[in-house]
Amino acid sequence: MGKMNVRKGDKVVVITGKDAGKRGKIIEAIPDKNKVIVEGVNVVKRHSRPTRKLPQGGIQEKEAPIDSSNVMLLCARCHKPTRVGRRILDDGTKVRVCKKCGEALQ
């Protein structure tokens, strides 16, 4: 399995699927399964029985994971979806860079 180019907290845009074009922030990254959970994307409904914790029960909406290959990172400077490159700085630290404008991504 390849390395994921996105991390928790990154702003991304969905490029394929039913939520294509939606933008959001990554809530959770699951590298073992190569999946990410993006806020407001791939929202599913879960039916739950009444429990002590949730005496009402009912239908809850929550975000489900999507494959990390279906999202692209949004560059903070050029505000466009971009591929991620890596560059080693003079002091030896690795940084992710925008392939479109060359800006370092945090």
UniProtKB/Swiss-Prot annotation:
InterPro entries: KOW, Rib_uL2_dom2, Ribosomal_uL24, Ribosomal_uL24_CS, Ribosomal_uL24_KOW, Translation_prot_SH3-like_sf. Pfam families: KOW, ribosomal_L24. SMART domains: KOW (SM00739). Transmembrane segments: none annotated. PANTHER family: MITOCHONDRIAL RIBOSOMAL PROTEIN L24 (PTHR12903). Part of the 50S ribosomal subunit. This is Large ribosomal subunit protein uL24. The lineage of its organism: Bacteria, Bacillati, Bacillota, Clostridia, Thermoanaerobacterales. The gene is rplX.
